[in-house]
Amino acid sequence: PLFRSKIIINANMRTAFPNINSNDLNKTTRLMWNNYGRVFAEYVFIKDFRNGKLTSNIQIDGQEILDEIIKQNNQVVFISGHLSNFELMAMHLEKSGIKLCAIYRPLNNVFLNNIMERIRKKYICQYQIEKGLGGLRKLISLKKQNFSTALMIDQRVSEGILSKFFNTEALTTTIPAQLVKKF
């Protein structure tokens, strides 16, 4: 699996940075794996992040915007990518008092997915919605209760609209736009 990952990572890096030299490619790949390992290791401390014991390790920019969303009781669609520890975003939104549901794609590893679901529901965001038709009913129900939604938009999708991404046609999710239009 790691060999396959390396091929995909190198191909993607060369698509994004066609002039990258081998040294920079290897360095960037090492940094990527380093970040991936840190995020994985931070799950051990996710309870401490939730309980406020590690707040000095987190920097929030734009808290005043979140405070305004809460004050106005607005429903918002939060979009992000898998940057640093992406789980902390949903955790902070929920801890701030925003009624939040998070859309997720189940992990390929069924056993690990069950563990991650429990961790996410207990410490990150109580309302976890599985991506796809199965979670749609739950999402609609929560949206009608004025819940905001958090989702990562940097994953491969099987449906959407075709758009140019690094000069290649790629399916692009329309979920954020659909949520804003409908709710």
Where are these regions (language model features)?
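Soluble catalytic domains of membrane acyltransferases
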Residues: 47-183
